[in-house]
A protein has these predicted regions:
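Residue-level detector of alpha-helix initiation sites
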Residues: 21, 82-83, 107, 213-215, ...
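Beta1/beta-strand and adjacent pyrophosphate-binding region of the FAD-binding site
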Residues: 74-81, 206-210
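Conserved beta-strand-loop-beta-strand element in the redox core of flavoprotein oxidoreductases
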Residues: 148-154, 273-301
Length: 373
């Protein structure tokens, strides 16, 4: 804050990178929990810390990373080119280790690139952060999928350490009949397609999105920008119970998104061609409130029909676990299970961190320093 106040923007970026190699990205999308705890709140309002990060990034220009420590001769493979993997690669490279990032998609960034819409995070600004990370000497191998193009066993033979930071990039299912119908897509896949410029024309269509998190808000607002005639959010609890940021909810409402709250998905309606026509939802009521969050139960009323041409499911994310289980890596309830250090009991030199080990979290990068540890 003091450095920005003095106009020393490049120094501010250097300071931020000591703990977080994505200062520009955070200036756009960080959930700024630090502002909620800012002591200035005792006087009037918090300091706009996220905004100051963005000011520093906007005015600093290109700031080179610090010089790396002398080489240790150690080689580290990092599986996953998202924020966790790139953060680990950055700090490990600065320590003198040679890191190689394996990424299955064409470009680095993970959910930052393929999950967050461009209106929230311009991809050229994300590239500013990634470019600085790669300047440290991090090597990259794109288009390789673990278990298909290369195995954990092969990587263990080639590298001193293997770090798994694959994130949580697959979707959870509703568990309803006809969920495989045409016109139904997960929010993760929908946003990934948009991120890869595989644009879906939604002109004149009715779109329903199930879920109340930030991914849900990204999906509905993206659908609106793709020309949808009507976009609705279907959520089983209250607006107050949504995990999305208040600003994202307000933005969606301001753009004409309809909020269908206290409605739980019950069944999916399809036509003779097995294309989604709509969804039946069961009205809910609050049965109790604990720690500010409502528990719900059916009201006993008849199900309500919500017509839609496209149904987007945004109820959470999982990780791809099949190959890792085959490699002897413990997996439980959609997470890779590690010791507190990120290591495994019977796999020396193999570690895991980020969303795949802790469970899906916000991409405001609060966890990224853990990946380097």
């Amino acid at each position: 804050i003091a450095l920005v106040g003095e106009g020393r923007y490049a120094d501010a970026i250097r300071l931020l990178r000591k703990d977080n190699p994505f200062p520009t990205t955070c200036g756009f999308i960080c959930e700024h929990p630090c502002e909620a705890r800012c002591r200035r709140n005792m006087v009037d309002d918090s300091i706009n810390i996220r905004g100051l990060k963005r000011v520093a990034a906007d005015f600093a220009g290109e700031v080179d990373p610090p010089q790396c420590a002398p080489s240790t001769g150690k080689k580290i493979a990092i599986l996953g080119g998202g924020p966790g993997g790139l953060s680990a690669a950055y700090y490990l490279q600065l320590m003198g280790h040679q890191t190689t990032v394996y990424e299955m998609l064409p470009e680095l960034g993970g959910m930052l690139r393929y999950g967050i819409p461009n209106y929230r995070l311009p991809k050229e600004r994300l590239d500013d952060d990634i470019r600085a990370i790669l300047k440290t000497g991090v090597q990259v191998k794109n288009g390789l999928k673990i278990g298909q193009d290369i195995t954990i066993q092969e990587l263990r033979q080639q590298y001193d350490v293997v770090l798994i930071t694959i994130g949580a990039s697959t979707d959870k299912k509703l568990g309803l009949e006809n969920e495989d119908a045409d016109g139904i897509i997960s929010a993760v896949q929908f946003l990934r397609n948009v991120g890869k410029n595989q644009i879906i024309d939604l002109t004149g269509k009715e779109v329903a999105v199930i879920g109340g998190g930030n991914v849900s808000m990204d999906a509905v607002r993206t659908a609106k920008r793709l020309g949808a005639k009507k976009v609705s959010i279907v959520y089983r609890r209250r607006v107050a119970d949504m995990t999305a940021l208040p600003g994202e909810i307000e933005g969606a409402v301001a753009e004409g998104i309809e909020l269908q709250t206290l409605k739980a998905p019950a069944s999916i309606d399809v036509d003779e061609n097995h294309h989604v026509k709509g969804i039946y939802v069961t009205p809910q009521m609050v049965s109790s409130i604990r720690d500010g969050r409502a528990s719900i139960k059916p009201t006993g009323e008849e199900d309500i029909y919500i017509p839609c041409d496209v149904l987007i499911v945004a109820i959470g994310q999982n990780i791809e676990t099949h190959h890792f289980e085959q490699a002897g890596i413990p997996v439980e309830r959609g997470k890779i299970i590690t010791k507190s250090t990120g290591a495994f009991e019977n796999l020396p030199g193999v570690f895991a961190g980020g969303d795949c080990a802790s469970g899906p979290a916000s991409v405001c990068l609060l966890y990224t320093s853990d990946a380097a540890d």
